[in-house]
Amino acid sequence: MTLEITGSELIKSKLIDAPERSGVYRMFDVNKQVLYVGKAKNLKKRLTNYIKSNLDNKTLRMIANTCFLEYSITNSEVEALLLEAQLIKKFQPKFNILLKDCKSFPFIKLRLEHDFPQLLKYRGKTLSDGKFFGPFASSVDVNTTLTELQKIFKLRSCTDNYFNSRTRPCLQYEIKRCYAPCVGKINKEDYRDLVTQVKDFLQGRTKELQENLSRKMEELSSQMRFEEAAEIRDRIKALSYVQLKAGVSDVVKDADIIAIVEKNGHYCVEVFLYRAGQACGNIPYFPTSTENSTKEEVLEYFLLQFYQKQHVPAAIIINHEINDKENVIEAIKKINNILQLNITVPNKGGKAKLVQNAEINALFSLEQYLKKFAKNQEIIFEIKELFGLSAIPERIEIYDNSHIQGKFAVGVMVVAGKVGFDKKEYRVFNVYAPSLVCHSRESGDPKRLMDSCFRGNGIKNCWGDIKGDDYEMLRQVLTRRLTRLRQEPHKLPSLMIIDGGKGHLGVVKEVMDKFEMNIPFVCMSKGVDRNAGFEQFHVIGKEVFTLDKNLPVMKYLQILRDEAHNFAIKNHRLGRSRAIKISRLDDIEGVGETRKKALLHYFGSYKAVCDATIYELAKVNGINKLLAEMIFNVLHRKN
């Protein structure tokens, strides 16, 4: 493709028609991939800045790569801010300040629709059908809190199906973490009282809760019910301990404390969560593409990206002012459909102390991050030298597969870069039988037939039965990956590492030649006895070589290989479990998803359905006697 003008000349040509209004502009590279998204109060003035002479290196690189420029006019600065945030989230442009690995925070959910409510962990933006507490900074914080709550209040954590199928108490009852409502060890009224206590505790009403429990303990003691009184006493002690360990604030009730710090051009933003006056954990973030950016810019971009995924508290307390605070507040309110929000920078008092504490933690987190970053940089440079790469690798893709005697085969790709693993870029490839792949290619769509088969009941017969052919697995995975890379050239890896030996080397070369691509690759195989530390490396045109197992670069390569290996095993097991769940019920004519769910809900498990009589089967809604007989006969026939 021949482009008439690019870079600063392109921007100059666009300035002629650029309006003096608020809006958002987008810069694209030669492949129409978004390089940068920016907002402007005045589009013409903002674009004029890009043709000045005093630009920093990052901006100069961006302009040099710009081949296309588009802009959209908005009705206000707030709309421009909103559109910019949405486009950054969608396209993740390489020259924008980006917030990586920002998962939604987990909650504790109390399911109230059941007679005996369940306490469980929940992650998601939509909070409905229950009572929610949190968010918490990590799964560890949620799991720790849930464990403590189960020890103190002994509410059930099992699913409804498991609950309905119990005939005797489970292990949770034996270790005193559940009152076993499934088998009637506690009545509804007493259980509901425990649910109320849990809600009081999680909503921060601990003082009232402890006073109520103390009164109840005295009543039980006066009635000579000493065992029950002792249990209440232990609950009060446990609550005091948990409260002390978690940390309670009288300064803030519902707030996020956010501190930003900078060192050597790198930034860390530390977030502390407080809900109902209780500390719910903290987590550090390290925004990328922050070269030549100010604290104000980084913090503004952080807030807009962070609160697209997270629930907004009543107050956001930060350690540094941002330039466009009022518009940022309005944008966050619109994103989350809320009416009230305060963003403040305290100078003194209890809130200032909380911010100071967040700053101390942020500095510590940044120092640890920079040590890890520097070590990674050294190792990545060694990888460049080791495999004769033309430049320091920005993106390394590692491939592995997993199967059992060729069954349920999956291939995986994990991705690593300068700052570690990029889990958003991980991919899973379900590997299909060669005959199916050939047939689907002949039909003109190499994936449609396989996907339809995978969704259907023939999953065991069409997916993953590859007869243990590692080369065919790799051939399929790389064919699909390189096909995708043709559509996404900006994601071309600097290096591919394949878990395999000399034979795999030939397969990779074959697929590369077919696609006329020349991506550097290496195959990494275990030694003669398959022991870690004796890995062999296979590169086209070189003799097989090994590395000293104590070298940092060798340990790093092992970490990459192990990450791919573990990811492959995890997804193989998921696929196998999915296939195993397809039972004989799927072979019965007249039993679709609705009736299958009705059977499993009524009896609680597949085994219980198998053990049921014809009379019991006919009791299920939607199952008549004739169908019950058919189900019974199919479930009891010999293989």
Swiss-Prot record:
Compartments (UniProt record): Cytoplasm
Source organism, top-level taxon: Bacteria
Organism of provenance: Rickettsia rickettsii (strain Sheila Smith)
Subunit structure, as described in the record: Interacts with UvrB in an incision complex.
GO annotation, cellular component aspect: cytoplasm; excinuclease repair complex
GO molecular function annotation: DNA binding; excinuclease ABC activity
UniProtKB keywords: Cytoplasm, DNA damage, DNA excision, DNA repair, Excision nuclease, SOS response
Function of the protein: The UvrABC repair system catalyzes the recognition and processing of DNA lesions. UvrC both incises the 5' and 3' sides of the lesion. The N-terminal half is responsible for the 3' incision and the C-terminal half is responsible for the 5' incision.
Entry's transmembrane regions: none
Domain UVR, residue spans: 207-242
Start and end residues of each GIY-YIG domain: 20-97
Major location (coarse): cytoplasm
Identification of the protein by name: UvrABC system protein C
Classification via InterPro entries: GIY-YIG_endonuc, GIY-YIG_endonuc_sf, GIY-YIG_UvrC_Cho, RuvA_2-like, UVR_dom, UVR_dom_sf, UvrABC_protein_C, UvrC
Record-stated family: Belongs to the UvrC family.
UniProt cross-references to Pfam families, sorted A to Z: GIY-YIG (PF01541), HHH_5 (PF14520), UVR (PF02151), UvrC_RNaseH (PF22920), UvrC_RNaseH_dom (PF08459)
SMART domains xref list: GIYc (SM00465)
GO BP term, example: SOS response
